Amino acid sequence: AISLTGKYSSNGVHTQNGYNMAVDRINSMGGIKVGGKTYKFEIIYYDDESNPKRAAQLAERLIKQDGVEFMLGPYSSGLTKAIAPVTEKYGVPMVEANGASRSLFTKGYKYLFAVLAPANLYLDVAIDLAVEKNGGKPVSVAMAFEQDAFSQDVRLGVLDAIKRTGSKK
């Protein structure tokens, strides 16, 4: 499931393009060899409409009806959070490239794998850089964040960096 419509559609289309490019490249190079067998990839897409409930329904459909054995994650922490319990329930590995909320990785999921740093580290070095550019002196930081899990994780990382550097919010 991927967001082809709704509020995440722009990023969903970019994610789909990236997945397609990777699969085309892997398949053009002969596929992946595992245990003496060679496998080529095929991706099945359904539009989750940027809706977590719909994403979870489609993940279940992909596993139960379409028989997928491996899942590539959707765009956003919220949609990944909706799909992860489904992939966990059926023991289907999911590699997600677009969900970085810390809360995704505190649930003990055995089948969820990430390629991104956690969201709380996104702006960590930005505060360090600001302090460095300020001659090593603490800085004042203005913050404005959305109320979703991802944004709040980024916010917590900024607060940690502010505290660590002696800066102020």
Can you describe what each PLM-predicted range is?
Residues A1-K7:
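Acidic/histidine-rich, surface-exposed loop or edge segments in extracytoplasmic proteins
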Residues K7-Q16, A117:
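Active-site pocket-shaping loop/turn-to-helix segments
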Residues Y8, I32, L104:
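Short clusters of hydrophobic/aromatic residues that line enzyme substrate/ligand-binding pockets
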Residues G12, Y19, L58:
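N-terminal cofactor/phosphate-binding cores enriched in small/glycine residues
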Residues N17, K53, V68-K169:
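Extracytoplasmic ligand/sensor domains, especially the bilobed periplasmic-binding protein
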Residues N17-E42, G136, K163-K168:
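Signal peptide-proximal N-terminal region
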Residues T38-F41, Q57, I63-D66, K89, ...:
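Extracytoplasmic
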Residues I44-Y45, E49-E69, V131-K133:
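Short, well-structured alpha-helical segments in soluble
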